[in-house]
């Protein structure tokens, strides 16, 4: 018996009046994940594109793969570089992860396999925890409300996991995604009704609730007893010269050969996935362009103002592009169609607001060198207001034109 036949055979048990009626959302989630939805229109439909929510979310999920796999490689590569430079640290490591890594691979920084295995030993448990805990809340709320489980959580789960440092405790991962899904989305009605990006809500909660595990110099590698600063922290401490002084070139930063959150280091990998999102029109090019233009304009403004005490004023825009979570946030977070502005003009303004805000936070705030997360959440709050004024301006313009 094929899987399709098996699902069809048990379907009546989950429908209204069936033995497992209350579990229909779970059945529907499995069925639509494995096969296309069976619902059809009852009357003539005017379809511009056959894409549905399921296909859209799966495309976004697949577009994170370049950043995901490079992130796993880079986590392992950074750790193995440290072990090669300080062999004594290798003997000080313990735990189930290192037992697993030792059984499946080695600690050679020049071995692709060794680096991937080490990175996977840190990323996959984080992703699995995110998926299981967040999925539990999705299914619970869908069951209570008696509606289908949406595929949007596939995207939320992977984006949340990719924004975390490799050393984050798994219980904090569970707590963060619970906060993001429940208070960032479900309390407002679920998929399509949230005004904040749930992945960023969860990440912001962890940042403010557990700053010791989300920031500083000791959280960006998987090596216990080692502290290493991110490129953005180096820039905040001494500008671009400080970054270059630590042996990190712009090309290294662009390719992602540096410490940072698991999925945010490689601008190249992020742009590969972003190109697909833009070509398929899932992501709005207006938002991406607005973020870039806002960031570049503010960067030139700060460069012109200058500062003798704050080296971030002199940092060029192309360094801001490849440091921190700017590229990841611009491509995957800012373009969330639910929490972003919906009008064309509003998308430009929404993106520009993010670009301006991230520069203000990075440059002017000495205690917080990264600003993309807060900039996007700030813009999410203003997205409805931006659309309101754009619509009102359009109404006034049409009234003036047509009398």
UniProtKB/Swiss-Prot annotation:
Any one GO biological process: respiratory electron transport chain
The UniProt record lists the keyword Lipid metabolism: no
Record-listed E.C. numbers: 7.2.1.1
Keyword tags: Cell inner membrane, Cell membrane, Flavoprotein, FMN, Ion transport, Membrane, NAD, Phosphoprotein, Sodium, Sodium transport, Translocase, Transmembrane, Transmembrane helix, Transport, Ubiquinone
Residues with FMN phosphoryl threonine modification: 230
NCBIfam families listed in its UniProt record: nqrB, PRK05349.1
PANTHER family associated with the record: ELECTRON TRANSPORT COMPLEX PROTEIN RNFD (PTHR30578), NA(+)-TRANSLOCATING NADH-QUINONE REDUCTASE SUBUNIT B (PTHR30578:SF1)
Similarity comment: family membership: Belongs to the NqrB/RnfD family.
Self-association and partners: Composed of six subunits; NqrA, NqrB, NqrC, NqrD, NqrE and NqrF.
Protein name: Na(+)-translocating NADH-quinone reductase subunit B
